[in-house]
Amino acid sequence: MESATKQRRDNRAPREQEEKQFEERVVSIDRVARVVKGGRRFRFRALVVLGDKKGKVGIGIAKGADVQAAVVKAVDMAKKNLVVVPIFNGTLPHEAQAKVAGANIFVKPASPGTGLIAGGVVRTVLEVAGYSNALSKSLGSSNKINSAYATIAALQSIASSDKWVVEPVSATKKATKPTKAKAQK
């Protein structure tokens, strides 16, 4: 009888499954066309949002001959475009707003237990980034690509986490609110 682990002829070790470090969400898949002399040539475009639920999030857009090829390329693109966003007690440290093309996105912190009150691609970006409580409003264009980029821009506009000081909870204070650290001269 052979052993439980089968020895390969070429003495290679068995392939190890790569554990998923990031959660990926396919936001949209579109069929796009380019017009050539003989008619139209179709390809697929995929928009993927990728994050680790710990403050890293990225967006990737790619085209491919079939859906799977487009998604794989978009995931690779999203991994190259990862940004770090601050998370404070599962929510945002303060309000933020950004506009990309026609999409105007407004994100705001929420108290614990509120959940994510956001629609469409904004909700997806906030979920994979790791936010559990946040409010958002999408104004202007509802284009998924521009909304995704505007959400990332709004999250990046938030001051970095080292500028936010958390005050210890005393017997008289019930809520902990972030206070902006004073600039030292």
Where are the language model's segments positioned?
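Intrinsically disordered, compositionally biased charged tails
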Residues: 1-20, 162-185
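Conserved mixed alpha/beta catalytic, RNA-binding, or beta-rich assembly cores of soluble enzyme
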Residues: 46-82, 86, 90, 108
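Glycine-rich phosphate/pyrophosphate-binding loops
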Residues: 129-145
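Short beta-strand elements
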Residues: 31, 42-52, 107, 124-127
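Short, flexible loop/turn motifs enriched in small residues
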Residues: 38-44, 118
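Short, ordered loop/turn segments at secondary-structure junctions
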Residues: 53-54, 62-64, 110-112, 121, ...
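A charge-rich, low-complexity, intrinsically flexible signal that marks solvent-exposed coils, linkers
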Residues: 86, 145-149, 153-165
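Glycine/charge-rich, flexible interdomain linkers and switch-proximal surface loops
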Residues: 84-107, 166-178
